């Protein structure tokens, strides 16, 4: 009853904010000046010295951010973990999610041969880095390192037509709308579709070309999903086509195809389920963006994936596994400081290949734990009345999320978020008991520099 009341209050607050947009717009105070960024501080020192530094001469740029949050779980799970969440994994706890430092030199297509060369090094520290570390075939690891190079690549723009950009190294994936950095997403938490069904990063070679302001195409050959070290002899092909036919509408079409399984996975013998180096994973999806008004943006993301030899459902082991979903976002910018965001998602893991592969909890088998606590579930009943888990659970998941964002300064972002998760299986924990739903309330602070 408490959760329902809180949900009702949250919805009433969101409706009130949306309906009072005109009042906010008229009465909002001017945005205070933001503290200087790291790049601006460097430029100020250069002015004092009356001489350009090597930093400026080489075109280097530095930036970063700090991300901390508190998440409360109304189910009060006995494991102190939010089931099936990716980064916001600790229940009723503060988390130092990420401290990121990025050094880059963007390549300049209109510059000299030397200016056409560039690089990016993006280094992560914090609890999120335990998850963003490169993973092979999405199997849980045992290390607890809280440092990870999210991106580390060199680039060069060849003088071909409008400029052919060549990138080589570790880069954020082309797949999906959401990304690792929370402040670049509409909401604090991530979708099941991104966290459990898509790649985070890829390592390899990528080519990008802008034909005109309306069409950009990117293709790449990479080691595979989240693989710095390739886990097989095959390579994965990735692509993205971004179209902007109108200033109020954009459509991107992405995908990848290639072998993602290694010869061995844990105790699974070569050629067994999830360990066939020739099994192909195919992914396609799109991102549709509508700028309905100057203040309202709608994003839709349909997504489909299929992989051979990955099904973990009893009696179907070794067959194809399918996972697919649909994400929908509404972003309403009330003014320069306030913004309300609503997200809805459905994610189906028909083969049990993507969900609950982290660890399980229950009265039988206990709780094994995984660094970061991601992709955990309550144990499921066995045929003899006990509880079993691990190996994934075929299910359909829903996520409804309401986020209110306030930026008192351009460099300071604060968020309050209520999220409701539901499954057609009892994979969540309510205390020590299994449940088919989970509610969380989060507060986040991000400082950009």
Language-model features: where?
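N-terminal periplasmic/intermembrane-space "pro-region" immediately following the signal or transit peptide
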Residues: 2-86, 372-387, 449
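Outer-membrane beta-barrel pore domains and translocons
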Residues: 67-71, 122-126, 169-173, 220-225, ...
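Surface-exposed coil loops of outer-membrane beta-barrel proteins
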Residues: 77-91, 128-246, 252-273, 361-382
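Glycine- and aromatic-enriched membrane insertion/assembly motifs of diderm outer-membrane
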Residues: 82-127, 331-333
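Outer-membrane beta-barrel pore domains
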Residues: 85-88, 129-132, 138-142, 249-449
């Amino acid at each position: 009853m408490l959760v329902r009341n809180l949900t009702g209050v949250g919805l009433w607050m969101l409706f009130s904010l949306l309906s009072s947009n005109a009042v906010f717009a008229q009465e909002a105070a001017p945005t205070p000046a933001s503290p200087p960024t790291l790049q601006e501080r460097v430029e100020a020192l250069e002015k004092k010295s009356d001489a350009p530094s090597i930093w400026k001469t080489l075109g280097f740029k530095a930036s970063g951010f700090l991300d901390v949050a508190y998440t409360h779980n109304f189910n009060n799970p006995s494991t102190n973990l939010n089931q099936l969440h990716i980064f916001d994994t600790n229940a009723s706890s503060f988390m130092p999610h990420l401290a990121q430092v990025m050094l880059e030199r963007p390549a300049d297509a209109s510059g000299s041969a030397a200016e056409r060369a560039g690089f990016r090094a993006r280094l992560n520290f914090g609890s999120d880095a335990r998850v963003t570390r490169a993973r092979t075939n999405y199997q849980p690891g045992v290390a607890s390192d809280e440092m990870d190079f999210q991106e580390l690549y060199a680039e060069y723009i060849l003088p071909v037509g409008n400029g052919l950009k060549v990138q080589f190294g570790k880069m954020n994936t082309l797949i999906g709308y959401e990304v690792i950095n929370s402040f670049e997403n509409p909401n604090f938490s991530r979708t099941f579709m991104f966290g459990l069904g898509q790649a985070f990063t890829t390592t390899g070679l990528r080519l990008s070309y802008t034909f005109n302001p309306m069409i950009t195409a990117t293709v790449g050959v990479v080691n595979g999903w989240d693989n710095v070290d390739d886990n097989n002899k095959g390579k994965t092909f990735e692509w993205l086509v971004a179209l902007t036919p109108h200033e109020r509408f954009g459509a991107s079409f992405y995908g990848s195809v290639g072998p993602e399984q290694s010869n061995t996975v844990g105790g699974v013998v070569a050629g067994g389920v999830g360990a066939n180096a020739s099994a192909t994973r195919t992914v396609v999806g799109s991102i549709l963006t509508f700028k309905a008004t100057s203040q309202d943006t709608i994003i839709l993301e349909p997504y489909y994936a299929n992989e051979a030899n990955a099904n973990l459902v009893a009696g179907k082991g070794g067959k194809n596994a399918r996972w697919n979903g649909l994400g929908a976002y509404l972003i309403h910018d009330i003014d320069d400081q306030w913004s309300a965001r609503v997200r809805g998602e459905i994610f189906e893991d028909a083969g049990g290949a993507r969900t609950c592969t982290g660890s399980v909890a229950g009265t039988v088998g206990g709780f094994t734990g995984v660094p970061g606590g991601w992709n955990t579930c309550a144990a499921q009943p066995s045929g003899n009345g006990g509880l079993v888990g691990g190996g994934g659970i075929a299910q359909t998941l829903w996520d409804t999320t309401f986020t209110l964002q306030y930026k008192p300064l351009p460099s300071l972002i604060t968020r309050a978020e209520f999220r409701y998760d539901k499954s057609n299986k009892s994979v969540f924990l309510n205390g020590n008991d299994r449940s088919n739903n989970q509610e969380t309330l989060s507060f986040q602070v991000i400082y950009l520099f």
